[in-house]
Amino acid sequence: MGHESPTIEFLGLTFSQSNLLMVTVASVIVFLIAVLCTRTLAMKPSGAQNFIEWVLDFVKGLVNSNMDWKTGGRFLTLGVTLLMYIFVSNMLGLPFAIVIDHNLWWKSPTADPAITLTLAVMVVVLSHYYGIKMRGFSAYTKDYFKPMAFLFPLKIIEEFANTLTLGLRLYGNIYAGEILLSLLAGLATTGFLGTIGAAIPMLLWQGFSIFVGAIQAFIFTMLTMVYLSHKVSSDH
């Protein structure tokens, strides 16, 4: 998109200020949605409560499709949080981008590989943690030598591949969408004909990007449940 992200140094590490800002914004939005949707609960839900119950039922279906509820019920909150957080993050960069002094401040946080790979690493680490916690270290390690011991190196490579593909898939789709939107926005500033030519494609692509953002949030959450089920279920 041709703009740099402002950075800050802390303890010898470099952090992107725009990433910190947008991660915070996404977190606050998800928190507010959760609070507003559960503020006044009723036996006969309506409006916002219907929405949050639909999200819960949807994620519960993802859990049940990968493992039995007794094993996977504890991951419901994780799944709901990931689904809502990633969807909100994917949407933040769609309406506009804020650039100040050639520094890009407002964007989708998931359009940065540092964010998506961090989420992926968190998911994979959690899957290993729960695998050891729920099955024991011995049963957990034996899976790396099944069905044949010589496949152990491939199992290790698979773990790294899962982490990379989980994070980079999300990043690539969201970043590509923002690149195209920025190109269309640039075309719109070239004059009257450019504005006319870019307006309809931009609206269509923004609508399609909402669909893509929702699908990517679903895929990330689904794969999270798949990876967790592989580690915590004895039949995988």
UniProtKB/Swiss-Prot annotation:
It comes from the Bacteria. GO terms for cellular component: plasma membrane; proton-transporting ATP synthase complex. It is a multi-pass membrane protein. Keywords: ATP synthesis, Cell membrane, CF(0), Hydrogen ion transport, Ion transport, Membrane, Transmembrane, Transmembrane helix, Transport. One of its GO terms (biological process) is proton motive force-driven plasma membrane ATP synthesis. CDD domains: ATP-synt_Fo_a_6. Key component of the proton channel; it plays a direct role in the translocation of protons across the membrane. This is ATP synthase subunit a.
